[in-house]
């Protein structure tokens, strides 16, 4: 049994390294192509950041049912997003990392087909949630140059693709650590104070909605992917460490003035296309080991946050289950209008992610709205829309009570 486990782990690790090598190679080709294009153009003062997408209906012949409508907002003056690629609206565009999505076909369903750094074909949960609760149609990345006062006052995303609760996770891929995201948040608060004064700034921070999504990269990449922590911890100990780190982050948000804080758990990561490919065998089944780890972490995260919430005054701190909704979509795809749930729309859909999903080497599926996954790791805009609707309809109640 131990020999089989080690053999399987080494095999998965080799595949992961192969994917990383291909990503580096494709990134090099994309960089060379972009450099060649720049040499052929008239010089300009410097690249301008891509404009934020304008609000528009979700594309495709089979849009998700619009059961959730944007309402006039009298409760949340702003939204703040922290964590990984699920909520990253473009921060990775402005740091030195390979984990980027600022090129087509990412963003292909935004107006003018502008890729903004979101790891999706369109909007992501931070955008949908902000829109549904009446804050604004899209959430800009904090590191994006040229943010207006209005952009900042209504909230931004500090999230970074590839980050996690384990400090080692962002180091491996050069993402923004959770600790640095918190530093940016505190820096942001000072900017807001400069705009509207201390009292108004404290109101915005305390009444704004803070959403945190992380943990998937810790489990899928740091622990099981590269086995960087597997030799030091068993999965029970590691998930306890993750939950403790998450609770510490929650406390620091609270101490910074946030009073409405939601932590979204980890989805069934064993069922995402790349894990089916690398760990699911010839039949590409879900990787039960990863799904078990996700559920174990979610249980500990929920318990940790519930205990911590008892110590916080006038604060709503809640755990939000995403595993059940995500799993229901996988188990009952027709219920949600999906035809494909085990591969992504980009390329073969088996391994493509980041630089491997590009307009030069990757063909796209004919009907993206029928796919649950955009690349081998991230859901499509339509899948995100459905999940965000469920969140707003089922989990927002406690935030309105405070």
From Swiss-Prot:
Keyword Cell membrane: no
GO molecular function: lipase activity
Composition-biased stretches (Pro residues): 44-64
Chain intervals for the UniProt region annotation (Disordered): 41-69
GO cellular component, one term: extracellular region
GO BP, sorted A to Z: lipid catabolic process
Stated family: Belongs to the 'GDSL' lipolytic enzyme family.
Protein name: GDSL esterase/lipase At1g20120
Organism: Arabidopsis thaliana (Mouse-ear cress)
């Amino acid at each position: 049994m131990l020999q089989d486990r080690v053999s399987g782990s080494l095999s998965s690790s080799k595949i992961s390294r192969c994917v990383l090598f291909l990503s580096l190679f494709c990134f090099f080709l994309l960089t060379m192509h972009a450099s060649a294009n720049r040499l052929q153009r008239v010089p300009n003062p410097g690249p301008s950041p891509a404009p934020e997408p304008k609000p528009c209906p979700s594309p495709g012949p089979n849009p998700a049912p619009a059961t959730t409508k944007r309402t006039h907002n009298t409760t949340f003056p702003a939204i703040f997003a922290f964590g990984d690629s699920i909520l990253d609206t473009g921060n990775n565009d402005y740091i030195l990392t390979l984990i980027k999505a600022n090129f087509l076909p990412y963003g292909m369903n935004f107006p003018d087909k502008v890729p903004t750094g979101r790891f999706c074909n369109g909007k992501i949960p931070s955008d949908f949630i902000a829109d549904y609760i009446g804050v604004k149609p899209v959430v800009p990345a904090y590191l994006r140059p040229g943010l207006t006062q209005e952009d900042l006052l209504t909230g931004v995303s500090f999230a970074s693709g590839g980050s996690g609760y384990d400090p080692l996770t962002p180091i491996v891929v050069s993402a923004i650590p959770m600790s640095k995201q918190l530093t940016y948040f505190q820096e942001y608060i000072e900017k807001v104070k400069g705009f509207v004064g201390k009292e108004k700034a404290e109101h915005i921070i305390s009444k704004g909605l803070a959403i945190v999504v992380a943990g998937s990269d810790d489990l899928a990449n740091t622990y099981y992917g590269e086995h960087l922590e597997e030799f030091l911890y068993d999965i029970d100990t590691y998930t306890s460490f993750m939950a403790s780190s998450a609770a510490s982050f929650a406390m620091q948000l609270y101490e910074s003035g946030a009073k409405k804080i939601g932590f979204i758990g980890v989805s069934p990561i064993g069922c995402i296309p790349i894990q089916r490919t690398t760990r699911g065998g010839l039949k590409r089944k879900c990787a039960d080991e990863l799904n078990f780890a996700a559920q174990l972490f979610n249980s500990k995260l929920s318990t940790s946050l519930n205990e911590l919430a008892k110590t916080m005054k006038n604060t709503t701190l809640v755990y939000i289950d995403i595993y059940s909704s995500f799993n229901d979509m996988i188990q009952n795809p027709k219920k949600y209008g999906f035809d494909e749930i085990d591969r992504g729309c980009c390329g073969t859909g088996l391994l493509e992610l980041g630089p491997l999903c590009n307009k030069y080497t990757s063909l796209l599926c004919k009907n993206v709205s029928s796919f649950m996954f955009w690349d081998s790791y991230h859901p499509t805009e339509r899948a995100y829309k459905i999940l965000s609707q469920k969140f707003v309809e089922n989990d927002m109640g406690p935030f309105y009570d405070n």
